[in-house]
């Protein structure tokens, strides 16, 4: 296996919160419903959502930042162990297939008012 692409992104949590509050329906355009909710059905916290948004941006960068990708075609989910994972479908899966991506690695963090994500596409 070799690295096909690496993406990194950061999101200021308060700015991300303001964007969601200012733009009704934005969360639904960025995230699948299961990304918005915790396993117990409660709404996920803003820092966690900001990190997931950063991951989606990082995915696009790892794929060469092509246009035409849909936010909801890159889903960030978490294993029971707490390890973040990436599931791609539609436009993102098509671009990944073009490049020969076979696996993804994702790391999320949020601290001091900033959320960040690193994504590695491997093929």
Swiss-Prot record:
The EC number(s) this enzyme carries: 2.7.8.7
One GO CC term on file: cytoplasm
Single Gene Ontology BP annotation: fatty acid biosynthetic process
Cofactor or coenzyme needed: Mg(2+)
Keyword annotations of the record: Cytoplasm, Fatty acid biosynthesis, Fatty acid metabolism, Lipid biosynthesis, Lipid metabolism, Magnesium, Metal-binding, Transferase
Positions bound to Mg(2+): 9, 57
Reactions mediated catalytically: apo-[ACP] + CoA = holo-[ACP] + adenosine 3',5'-bisphosphate + H(+)
Enzyme class: transferase
Keyword Isomerase belongs to the record: no
GO MF terms, alphabetically ordered: holo-[acyl-carrier-protein] synthase activity; magnesium ion binding
Main location: cytoplasm
Record InterPro entries: 4-PPantetheinyl_Trfase_dom (IPR008278), 4-PPantetheinyl_Trfase_dom_sf (IPR037143), ACPS (IPR002582), Ppantetheine-prot_Trfase_dom (IPR004568)
Similarity comment text for this entry: Belongs to the P-Pant transferase superfamily. AcpS family.
NCBIfam families per UniProt: acpS, pantethn_trn, PRK00070.3-2
Function: Transfers the 4'-phosphopantetheine moiety from coenzyme A to a Ser of acyl-carrier-protein.
HAMAP family assigned to the protein according to its UniProt record, in alphabetical order: AcpS
Protein name: Holo-[acyl-carrier-protein] synthase
């Amino acid at each position: 296996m070799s690295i096909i692409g690496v993406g990194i992104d950061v999101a200021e949590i308060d700015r991300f919160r303001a964007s969601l509050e200012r733009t009704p329906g934005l969360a639904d355009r960025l995230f699948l419903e299961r990304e918005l909710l915790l396993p117990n059905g409660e709404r996920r916290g803003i820092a966690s959502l900001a990190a997931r948004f950063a991951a989606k941006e990082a995915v696009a960068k790892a794929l060469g930042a092509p246009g035409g990708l849909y936010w909801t075609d890159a889903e960030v989910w978490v294993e029971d162990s707490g390890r973040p994972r990436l599931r791609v479908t539609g436009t993102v899966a098509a671009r990944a297939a073009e490049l020969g991506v076979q696996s993804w690695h994702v790391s999320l963090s949020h601290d001091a008012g900033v959320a960040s994500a690193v994504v590695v596409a491997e093929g």
